[in-house]
Amino acid sequence: GREIRAIGNPKAATSFELFADVFINPATVHSKWITTTGTLLIVPLFGAIELVQEDRDAFIHINQVSKLWVKAGTKLQFKNIYPDHSVRFLMLLIKSDTAEPQSTVEYKLDMLNDLQEVHTDRSCSLNLGQFEGREETVYTYQRKDTSVFAYVLQGAFEFQNRLLETGEGLCIWDQNPIELEAL
């Protein structure tokens, strides 16, 4: 998998700390030490995972976003319960000192060629989308003095006139609205 950590902070309002695209082989466990206190978002892309933490377990399926508050120094274990299939999920950590209750919400990507908000709270908004080739959209964020991080799961995109291919991410700021085009 890939992991991206925030290095420096171009905007004071940006609290993005960690992004990871994680693959787990069949019947194995992926361990992760959390180094920053904050809100962790877990988004399975295919398969389901069992999350084991010191004081709780959770089972997270595809088409769900699970949110939990974690402290620095916490060890998380992600189990692939499938004996013959790999699983893949996204993990995003947003810095925060405010404890929030664990929650899981369902979403469905039933629209093509547009971004769909699958999670929002006072610190961040998470949008996912499926696009056909040569389709365009515009993303406008509501809060000023913030930044936007984009990551391409599969294919190629132009993100504000910058080429991104599978597994590449980009953080930009001071640009609103933002133009996206699937290639």
Enumerate the language-model features and the residues they cover:
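Short, charged, solvent-exposed linker or helix-capping segments at domain edges/interfaces
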Residues: 100-106
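Conserved SET/PR-domain catalytic core that frames the SAM/AdoMet-binding pocket
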Residues: 14, 20, 28, 40, ...
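Ligand-binding loop in jelly-roll beta-barrel domains
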Residues: 55-57, 71-100, 122, 174-183
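Short acidic-glycine-tyrosine-enriched beta hairpin
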Residues: 53-72, 110-113, 158-179
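Hydrophobic secondary-structure block in the mid-to-C-terminal portion of proteins
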Residues: 125-183
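A short glycine-rich, His/Asp/Glu-containing loop-to-beta-strand
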Residues: 1-33, 39, 106-141
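Short, charge-rich binding segments
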Residues: 31-35, 42-43, 58-61, 67-71, ...
